[in-house]
């Protein structure tokens, strides 16, 4: 095999990033609707800016949700609790513009009872294609760059909320990790970027000196804690708040909208994306549920040792339960003499990708031990609390391919 060397980069953002504030509010609203009425149809979008939250969208439900209370609770949990942030939980305006879902859409999703198979009664909420991916780069079968980027943001938030060190931290932050690969294997971390919102420099301390304190703290307490030491060398570059001062941030610094961080939510650019966002959508929307199912298929294929990498694409027509197409690609990493067609044939028999089957398999309309708000920061994949991360189909796949 010829030597192949390349660099690959993924980014993440904190729970206090404006777009993620919006995602979390949308999913918290969804959670409350589903708690009251598990058959709720929800498409909830949130807009956040200086001192203002606007929640809009379409809903069909028997539930009654207090948008004001939910939005303020989410903003409080994130940490926007000081007036100097210019976006504060108790004082920001909250406007609700939710209204009824179009009956034209609903008639295609909820089919007639006389259809014999219960899983054929629920059509896809829209057309589109969704992707799932898994690889052997990390124990959770996720690409390494996005995992490191997510964990940097989680660690930074953990430190901020504990309040024991780095007490100058504010909620908004971003990370980016560049890895060097050789023969498809991660060899080292080439660069790490962390930009974090912070308090102004203390009186008598220069901006340059303050930024040096922040840089050293981030490197020692965040980067070196998250990233394995054997991947960092003397040539690894650390870019900490590279533009300097980052005091103004959050929704006051940038407007936030639901659904603008779809690559952060998934695989960090290591796999294709169908374009549909997740947050604020109930599981009848295949943008969300089918993407979770596609990840489940890909992860089980890799966990079964059938391949080192796997991409799954599934597509739907609105109102039609069965997928229009299914495509599986193992990127020339299939094992045991298998090819993609053989793997796909068995996968299609084992994994039912009709929306109602997906919803039932993962209890997506009645989450147990998790909630949608949890998915809205730090990634929807690679986290064991979510049911689509289970690898319970490994034995069935192996048996079907005579590998058990």
Swiss-Prot record:
Main EC class the enzyme belongs to: transferase
Cofactor note as given: Binds 2 divalent ions per subunit. Binds 1 potassium ion per subunit.
Binding site for K(+): 45
EC numbers for this chain: 2.5.1.6
Entry keyword set: ATP-binding, Cytoplasm, Magnesium, Metal-binding, Nucleotide-binding, One-carbon metabolism, Potassium, Transferase
Cofactor: Mg(2+); K(+)
Location of region: Flexible loop: 101-111
A Gene Ontology molecular function term of the record: magnesium ion binding
Residues that, per the record, bind Mg(2+): 19
Keyword hit for Metal-binding: yes
Superkingdom of origin: Bacteria
Pfam families reported in the protein's UniProt record: S-AdoMet_synt_C, S-AdoMet_synt_M, S-AdoMet_synt_N
Residues given in the record as L-methionine binding sites: 58, 101, 254, 285
Binding site for ATP: 17, 172-174, 245-246, 254, 260-261, 277, 281
GO biological process, one term: one-carbon metabolic process
Catalytic activity, as annotated: L-methionine + ATP + H2O = S-adenosyl-L-methionine + phosphate + diphosphate
Subcellular location: Cytoplasm
Any single Gene Ontology cellular-component annotation: cytoplasm
Entry annotated with the keyword Chloroplast: no
Entry similarity comment: Belongs to the AdoMet synthase family.
Function: Catalyzes the formation of S-adenosylmethionine (AdoMet) from methionine and ATP. The overall synthetic reaction is composed of two sequential steps, AdoMet formation and the subsequent tripolyphosphate hydrolysis which occurs prior to release of AdoMet from the enzyme.
Subunit note: Homotetramer; dimer of dimers.
PANTHER family per UniProt: S-ADENOSYLMETHIONINE SYNTHETASE
Protein's recorded name: S-adenosylmethionine synthase
Organism: Pelodictyon phaeoclathratiforme (strain DSM 5477 / BU-1)
UniProt gene name: metK
